[in-house]
């Protein structure tokens, strides 16, 4: 198996773990809401969940830069990948 494929599988596993943690955090928020937890507790859990999701997004953006922009076969492909990334980041930030 080429190194790039092995790296992709490793990255996929890392992203799956991140998503599992996010799912657990969302479920914890749901349970807290069902048990009438305080607003402070809910906000604490929500910000932790948002931080985990931000980390997931950062990983995916990093992978996109490495796989599509840096490894582009030519300037046109790199430009297209960069434009796609700009749109994604813009929609994320606004």
Per-region residue spans from a language model:
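Solvent-exposed interaction patches of small proteins and small membrane subunits
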Residues: 1-94
């Amino acid at each position: 198996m080429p190194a790039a494929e092995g790296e992709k599988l490793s990255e996929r596993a890392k992203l799956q773990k991140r998503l599992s943690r996010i799912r657990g955090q969302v479920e914890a928020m749901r349970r807290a809401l069902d048990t009438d937890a305080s607003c402070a507790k809910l906000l604490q859990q929500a910000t932790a969940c948002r931080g985990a999701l931000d980390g997931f997004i950062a990983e995916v953006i990093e992978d996109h830069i490495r796989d599509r922009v840096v490894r582009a076969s030519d300037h046109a492909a790199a430009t297209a990948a960069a434009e796609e990334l700009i749109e994604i980041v813009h929609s994320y930030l606004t």
